[in-house]
Amino acid sequence: MSNGKIVQIIGAVVDVEFPRDAMPKVMEALKMQAPELTFEVQQQLGDGVVRTIAMGSTDGLRRGMDVLSTGNPIMVPVGQKTLGRIMNVLGDPVDEAGPIGAETTMPIHRKAPAYADQAATVEILETGIKVIDLIMPIAKGGKVGLFGGAGVGKTVTLMELIRNIAVQHSGFSVFAGVGERTREGNDFYHEMKEGGVLDKVALVYGQMNEPPGNRLRVALTGLTMAEYFRDEGRDVLLFVDNIYRYTLAGTEVSALLGRMPSAVGYQPTLADEMGRLQERITSTKTGSITSFQAVYVPADDLTDPSPATTFAHLDATLVLSRQVAELGIYPAVDPLDSTSRILDPQVVGEEHYTVARKVQGTLQKYKELRDIIAILGMDELSPEDKLAVSRARKLQRFLSQPFFVAEVFTGAPGKYVTLKDTIAGFKAIVEGEYDHLPEQAFYMVGGIEEAVEKAKTIQ
C-alpha cells in the first residue's frame, strides 16, 4: 500500500505519480477517498508515473490529490448473495437494497482455465425451446451469438432461457449489460421480477452514459461472478448484452491511452482483448459457463473487425428475424439462418441430425416456392410441391412455442419440451404422419400430442 499523487487528467485517463520503489503493477486498482473513485493501471510511464483509466467520472478531480494503491486488481463480490441484485463494475449495489454482504471477493483479471482442466466431452445443454434444441443445439460451455434487430424478442428469449436453466437445471445466470440503455436495463429488471426469475440471476450493468473504463470492465465483472458459480460445480448462463459495446469501449480507452489505431479505427489489441474475455468462458471438469452474447452488427456489415472477431469465438448463431416475427411465430428464430457447430451426427446422433436437416430442407423448398405461389397461387404447383408446402407450413407453426415468462402477456401456459419429444415430433411431421391435421393445430403448442389434441377441437 503506497500513496501517490495525481499529476495529469485527460478525460477518463489519469496519470498518478508514486515513489519509484513502490510503483503499482499494470491492472492494479488504485483508490481515492474524496471523491470516491477507483482507477485501473494501464501503463507504467517511468519516473514513478503510471497511466490509469478511471472507473467513474473524473469531474472535480485536480492535480495533487492523494491516491492509494490497493495491491490487488479490482475485487468484486461473488457467491449467492449477488443473486437478485443489480451491481456496477466494482460490484457495488445500485438497486438501493442495502449492501451485497458477500463473504468472498475475487479479482476480475484471471487466467483462463488450463487446457488440462477443461471438459473434454461435448454435452448438449437442453433448453426446452424446440427450435433451439433441434436446429442449433447448444453445447454446455458453448458460446452463442444472438443476432436481431429491435423488437423481435431478444429479451424475452433470454428471459425464457434464464427461467428454463433455473427451473430444469437448478442453474444460476449472470447478466452483464455492457453499454446498455439504462431504460432497457430497467425494463429487463422489472420483467425478470414479474417473470419470477430474479432470485436466480445476478445483474451487472455498465450503461451507455458511463465512462469507457466501466463499460470495458463490466463484462469481466459479470464473468468473474459466473466463474465462481462454475467452480462450485454448477451450470451457469452468462448473458452479455452487447458484446459490440465491449469492443467499442476498448476503442475509446485505446485512443485515450494514445495507441495507434488499426483497421476502421479499432484498437490494435482488439483480438487480444476479445480472446482474453472469451477464453475464460468455458467448461471445466467441475461446471460450465454457457454464454449468450447479443451482437450488434454496425451498418449490417459482417466483415467489420468487431463482429468478425466475435464470430471467430462463437459455437452457434441464433438469428431472430423480423419476417418470422411478422408471421406471429415466436420465438422468431430464423431456422435457415441459425447454425450450430455441434449439429453433427457424431455429437447429436444420426437421428437428430437427419431430422434437423430434413426440416431445414422442407422449409428451404417452401421459401423457393413462395414467389411462384404469390404470383400463380397454390393450384399451379405439382402434387409433390403442394405436399412439401403443406408440411413446411406445419413445421413453421410447430417451431413456435408458448413461453413461461410470456404467460402474463399471452395468457397461454408456458411449455418445456424435452429434446426427445422435439425430435420425435418433427420427425413425424416430416415423414407425413400428420398430413391429415390442419396447420393451425401446430401453432403455439408444446409437444406433438398437444397438436393432435388441439386438432380435435378445431375439427
UniProtKB/Swiss-Prot annotation:
Belongs to the ATPase alpha/beta chains family. The keyword Nucleotide-binding applies. The keyword rRNA-binding does not apply. InterPro entries: AAA+_ATPase (IPR003593), ATP-synt_VA_C (IPR055190), ATP_synth_F1_bsu (IPR005722), ATPase_a/bsu_AS (IPR020003), ATPase_alpha/beta_chains (IPR050053), ATPase_F1/V1/A1_a/bsu_N (IPR004100), ATPase_F1/V1/A1_a/bsu_N_sf (IPR036121), ATPase_F1/V1/A1_a/bsu_nucl-bd (IPR000194). ATP binds at residues 148-155. Its main location: membrane. It comes from Thiobacillus denitrificans (strain ATCC 25259 / T1). It is found in: Cell inner membrane. One of its GO terms (molecular function) is ATP binding. The gene is atpD. Coiled coil: none annotated. Keywords: ATP synthesis, ATP-binding, Cell inner membrane, Cell membrane, CF(1), Hydrogen ion transport, Ion transport, Membrane, Nucleotide-binding, Translocase, Transport. It holds the Pfam family ATP-synt_ab_N. It catalyses: ATP + H2O + 4 H(+)(in) = ADP + phosphate + 5 H(+)(out). This is ATP synthase subunit beta.
